[in-house]
């Protein structure tokens, strides 16, 4: 039962038997929580439940939560590999009560699992409680039979948890195990508490207060429980090891590294770093994070590049980390099926990133070596060099620090920061200054003054409103007249502001006094709609009553294209796998494109199936429905939330089509959180035509398509091309393909005949230089010839012909191209390869042509040189070598 997978199952099954709902791990990217970069605790997905903002259909739960601590204030990256317990990725086991049971039940459940489920010896266990929580101390005595010396009272914040400056909070009780006198350290609260003898493995948080302001706490009417047990730490205890890297899961991963690299671990930090970083990288990619130069993507890139640097330390000359992925999937795929679903994407992303970084890694390490040649233990690398490594070679600062760690050389962080700030200042100085920053202040002030614009565009394309502000050249203006380019804010609008990939609406704003042609609509700040346009005639002022009219035809095409992206997105997930997630989109009137996570190009057959599946839903002409609900309710119903999008408390859920196969049969085909405009029924899309797909980055593919009238125009153009081609070929349109194939066969035949004729002409003396074609040198037949205008790739074929014609001997040919460069081939017949090496002879010819090197086999070798005028001299040089 002591294996990692067994421990996880034992924990979850125990709490399930005790009435808890097993809730799947939430993604590593927290939903709707901008305060966190990554999920780092089990309670994160329940934060709104604890605060009362969200209701769940259960009052007790248990989870095994994926967690990452890298980046932000919770960052263990620098320590991983060098300590026994630091990890960037770990699993947090937990049980939770949302106003159900409280302190006594929580302690009793924990005690029974620890002593009966995990069979830990009672005499080695002890606990801490908050110094003011006498209730917890009394309960531990009652339930566990602990004496006072086994209950340690802690007065610091270590044993009092709070969500923030305000909100739910409460005392903690931590469970420790004594690992024995042979391990250094003292009990919690003692001067030696940082030692490893007394190991904390489970923290029970009793949420019983609400803090309304610092120091002011009121009892909660329904207190709750939040607990967290580190899975890897419990594995250490049950498996009797001091380091997480000696547990079964890590031993397997490290064993795969040893087998792949042929290098034993023997306490190597590099093996540990690679094993841990593979886990965090794989799970982050599976949850939608891809390497980039900002935000979460940059943290992932730092983790990946640190692993790659340690792979290089082990001697890796080719990408290594992706080769370890199957072992991880085998170990953890059953508990986390997203790893299995995204395996191809993870593998390709790791491989692409390793290939991209490998060359700069070598150059950067060379620069680092040169820069630190004269540095000794305790010295500091200057910040300028560290910044150059970051800026030019893609070395994150922590990678440079890690590379110097073994030599105990530090990095001047202040100097690094100064260098970065100087670069930013220089970049700003080169900026022409569009006034955008000042304009952003204007929008903030207008939002504060007028509030958000009321959007009416889901229900109408025409509305009346009142002008609230006119902005010209980045500043609020009193009025605008004919010819002025303006940005205008109105009290309410049917115009859609660009967001979610959908372009903003165009149209007309008119009044009794004039007209403004609107060329774009944008959103500024939180919900301020800004209409950009030109005053055609009249004068406009604040307070004017206006009529806003959206360009109906353009909006209709935008609706069709936006709805088509939803259908294509779902079809892609069905055809390629559920790892497919939208990474960006453009919904324009005439076309659409969107980027999705997928590791490799799609085949023509896959594109056709995706297109057919989407059009199948179009032909249903089924209604498109929209509903408002909470994010969690929407996701519970199967709605897809797009990675990186921020959602409010209430979201708009768009559903369309009816599934006809598999698990979706009879259910909505596509259901997504979306604030865009859509068709009323799928038939209004008309037709979807996929134009193609391409790469836009590591693990990201771009799909482009047209719909409706644009699709009809595209197909009409294609049809016209086929008719024109058929007329040129003098066949019917349906016969074009067979006629083209026949012409291609005929062309290949003629090209072969032409090549044969060229070879015969070349070897027959018609294009040769001044050297005799065949002669005897040192008793060996030697065919040496310089040939003009021959393709270098044909030289080997000519050399083979030459060998056939002379039977036994050496052939040396030099081809001179139109730009004066030369290619040389030397061939030796089988009976002479022990005497002459074609490689040695072709290098002699190359030297005569001003080149270097050359290579091949003993019987056939090729080289080149820049000086074709020395072709005859190259032939003679080979002849001299034969005679020598």
Swiss-Prot record:
Pfam families: DHHA1, tRNA-synt_2c, tRNA_SAD. It is found in: Cytoplasm. Belongs to the class-II aminoacyl-tRNA synthetase family. Zn(2+) binds at residues 562, 566, 674, 678. Its EC number is 6.1.1.7. Gene3D superfamilies: 2.40.30.130, 3.10.310.40, 3.30.54.20, 6.10.250.550, Bira Bifunctional Protein, Domain 2, Threonyl-trna Synthetase, Chain A, domain 2. It catalyses: tRNA(Ala) + L-alanine + ATP = L-alanyl-tRNA(Ala) + AMP + diphosphate. This is Alanine--tRNA ligase. One of its GO terms (biological process) is negative regulation of DNA-templated transcription. It comes from the Bacteria.
């Amino acid at each position: 039962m002591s294996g990692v997978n067994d421990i996880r199952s034992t924990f979850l099954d125990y709490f399930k038997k005790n009435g808890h709902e097993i809730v799947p791990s939430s993604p590593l990217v927290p939903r709707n929580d901008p305060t966190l970069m990554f999920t780092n605790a089990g309670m994160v997905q329940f934060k709104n439940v604890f605060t009362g903002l969200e209701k769940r259909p259960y009052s007790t739960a248990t989870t095994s939560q994926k967690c990452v601590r890298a980046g932000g204030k919770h960052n263990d990256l620098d320590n991983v590999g060098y300590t026994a317990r630091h990890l960037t990725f770990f699993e947090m086991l937990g049980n939770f009560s949302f106003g159900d049971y409280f302190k006594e039940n929580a302690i009793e459940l924990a005690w029974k699992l620890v002593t009966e489920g995990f069979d830990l010896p009672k005499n080695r266990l002890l606990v801490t409680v908050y110094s003011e929580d006498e209730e917890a101390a009394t309960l531990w005595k009652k339930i566990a039979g602990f004496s006072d010396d086994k209950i340690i009272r802690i007065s610091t914040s270590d044993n009092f948890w709070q969500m923030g400056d305000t909100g739910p909070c409460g005392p903690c009780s931590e469970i420790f195990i004594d690992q024995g006198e042979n391990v250094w350290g003292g009990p919690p609260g003692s001067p030696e508490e940082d030692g490893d003898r007394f190991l904390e493995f489970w923290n029970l948080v009793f949420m019983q207060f609400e803090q309304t302001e610092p120091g002011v706490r009121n009892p909660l009417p329904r207190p709750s429980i939040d607990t967290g047990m580190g899975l890897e730490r419990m594995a250490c205890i049950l498996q009797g090891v001091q380091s997480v890297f000696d547990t079964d899961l890590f031993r397997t991963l490290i064993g795969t590294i040893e087998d792949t690299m042929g290098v034993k671990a023997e306490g190597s930090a590099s093996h540990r770093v690679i094993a841990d970083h593979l886990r965090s990288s794989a799970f982050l990619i599976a949850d939608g994070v891809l390497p980039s130069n900002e935000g979460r993507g940059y943290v992932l890139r730092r983790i990946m590049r640190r692993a790659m640097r340690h792979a290089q330390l082990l001697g890796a000359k080719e990408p290594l980390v992706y080769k370890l992925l199957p072992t991880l999937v085998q170990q953890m795929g059953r508990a986390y099926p997203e790893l299995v679903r995204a395996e191809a994407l993870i593998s390709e992303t790791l491989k692409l990133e390793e290939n991209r970084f490998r060359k700069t890694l070598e150059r950067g390490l060379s620069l680092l070596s040169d820069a630190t040649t004269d540095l000794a233990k305790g010295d500091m690398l200057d910040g300028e060099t560290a910044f150059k490594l970051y800026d030019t070679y893609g070395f994150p600062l922590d990678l440079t620090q890690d590379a110097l760690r073994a030599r105990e050389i530090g990095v001047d962080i202040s100097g690094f920061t100064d260098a970065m700030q100087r670069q930013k200042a220089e970049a700003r100085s080169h900026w022409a200054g569009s006034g955008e920053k000042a304009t952003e202040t204007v929008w903030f002030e207008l939002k504060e003054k007028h509030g958000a614009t009321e959007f009416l565009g889901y229900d109408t394309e025409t509305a009346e409103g009142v002008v609230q502000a006119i902005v010209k050249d980045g500043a609020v203006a009193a009025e605008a007249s004919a010819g002025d380019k303006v940005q205008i804010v109105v009290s309410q609008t049917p115009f859609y502001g660009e967001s979610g990939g959908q372009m903003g609406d165009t149209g007309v704003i008119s009044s009794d006094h004039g007209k403004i042609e609107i060329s774009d609509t944008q959103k500024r700040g939180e919900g301020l709609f800004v209409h950009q346009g030109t005053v055609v005639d009249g004068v406009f002022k604040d307070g004017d009553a206006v009529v806003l009219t959206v360009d109906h035809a353009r909006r209709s095409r935008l609706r069709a294209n936006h709805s088509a992206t939803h259908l294509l997105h779902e079809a892609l997930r069905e055809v390629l796998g559920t790892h497919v997630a939208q990474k960006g989109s453009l919904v324009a009137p005439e076309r659409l494109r969107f980027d999705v996570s997928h590791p490799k190009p799609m085949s023509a057959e896959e594109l056709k199936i995706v297109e057919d599946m989407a059009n199948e839903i179009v032909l249903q002409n089924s209604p498109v429905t929209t509903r408002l609900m909470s994010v969690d309710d929407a996701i519970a119903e199967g709605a897809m939330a797009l990675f990186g999008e921020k959602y409010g408390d209430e979201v708009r859920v768009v559903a369309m089509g009816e599934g006809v196969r598999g698990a979706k049969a009879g259910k909505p085909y596509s259901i997504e959180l979306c604030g865009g405009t859509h068709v009323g029924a799928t038939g209004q899309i008309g037709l979807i035509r996929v134009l193609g797909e391409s790469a836009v980055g590591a693990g990201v593919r771009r799909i482009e398509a047209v719909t409706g009238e644009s699709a009809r125009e595209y197909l009409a153009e294609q049809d016209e091309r086929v008719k024109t081609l058929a007329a040129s070929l003098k066949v019917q349109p349906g016969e074009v393909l067979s006629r083209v194939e026949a012409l291609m066969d005929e062309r290949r035949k003629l090209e072969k005949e032409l090549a044969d004729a060229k070879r015969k002409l070349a070897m027959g003396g018609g294009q040769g230089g001044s050297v005799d074609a065949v002669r005897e040198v040192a008793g060996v037949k030697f065919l040496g010839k310089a040939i003009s205008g021959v393709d270098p790739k044909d030289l080997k074929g000519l050399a083979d012909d030459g060998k056939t014609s002379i039977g036994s001997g050496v052939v040396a040919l030099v081809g001179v191209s139109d730009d004066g460069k030369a290619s040389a081939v030397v061939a030796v017949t089988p009976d002479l390869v022990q005497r002459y090496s074609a490689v040695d002879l072709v290098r002699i010819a190359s030297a005569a042509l001003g080149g270097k090197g050359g290579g091949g086999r003993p019987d056939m070798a090729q080289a080149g040189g820049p000086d074709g005028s020395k072709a005859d001299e190259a032939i003679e040089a080979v002849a001299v070598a034969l005679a020598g």
